[in-house]
UniProtKB/Swiss-Prot annotation:
The lineage of its organism: Archaea, Methanobacteriati, Methanobacteriota, Stenosarchaea group, Methanomicrobia. The gene is priS. This is DNA primase small subunit PriS. Its cofactor is Mg(2+); Mn(2+). CDD domains: AE_Prim_S. The active site is at residues 103, 105, 284. It is an enzyme of class 2 (transferase). Its EC number is 2.7.7.-. GO terms for biological process: DNA replication, synthesis of primer. Belongs to the eukaryotic-type primase small subunit family.
Amino acid sequence: MKPATLEFLRQRFFAYYNGAIPGAGAGYSPESLTEREWGFLFFTENQRSGMRRHISFTSQDELTSYLKSMVPAHVYYSTAYYTHPGAAQMADKEWRGADVIFDLDADHIVRGPYDIMLARVKEELFKLIDMLTGELGFAKRDLRINFSGGRGYHVHLPLLSVRGWDTAERRELVNYVSGTGLSFDSMMAPSQKSGWKLRYHDALNDELARIAGLPCEDALSYLSGLSGISETFAAGFLKNISQTQNLLKSNPEKLLANKVVRAIANAENEPFQAGILSRAAQADEPVTTDVKRLIRHPGSLHGGSGMRVVPISVDQLDAFDPLIDAVVFGERNVSVDCAFNLSMPILGNNYTLTAGRNVVPEALGVFLCCRGIAELSGGI
């Protein structure tokens, strides 16, 4: 990033943290602010410059003063609570528990245009909320949801009841929402169809319907290609596939001994696993299991996009549009040099840019410069 671009971004972030932009400032205060470790990344020409961390604050005012004077590119605080959060060594901090966090990021879910990625991740968020509140006993009021300012959402559970959970307990939770480790035997065993059992049966039913709809030769080739399934077994299965579909709905336990159904539902069988994945909430497992994680501070700016990390209630999610509601900079024109042709929606308008010099609204200019897609060419 060129020096002029760095200075442009520093100036705009300075204006935000110092209240020169309507609705600006990072006023949100996490639970027990004084027990959190804080970390910061800054706009710098030194590509090797790392995070400045092991910092603690005694009050919201002290944090606000730091943001105003230091103007960080990224602001993080620990999901963990510590007796001595500012200690330079992790062993000296004295861990006292941690919030449970789910990270939904497009980088792990889908690639494509920015607005498409954001819409897709939002679908995962709704699935996660449904599982947490409908199946795992958490109330909507327990959830602290933030747009990450980048390509996804963070869901916090800042509850005393989960604060002391270790990594294994947190892994069990994230494995549930992501559908990891589902057992064919337990999914087919007699019991009420709900939660993952219902989703599993739906995925298997869809896969059986897909196979039944294939040309006979293609279906036979697919089934005989499954581990342990001969062409003879596959042919016999195809003759009775409608009966298998009926059993899945009425007496699924009778399919426990069916070699072909078991092979179809094998964890290595990609078509069926794609059906499971589409019904899962694709949370990033390492984030949830990490009991000493740093997470983005709501109200701060994301140095990779220039957008705000926005707290959102469950009831606001449907209407929330990150490319409008998380954008803090306005429509003042700036001139940028784009690295390539692109099309980008922001603030309710779609902008088509060509490689080279373009005059764009400041909101888009900040975004492109933060993303490394463009450099400032004038217009501060």
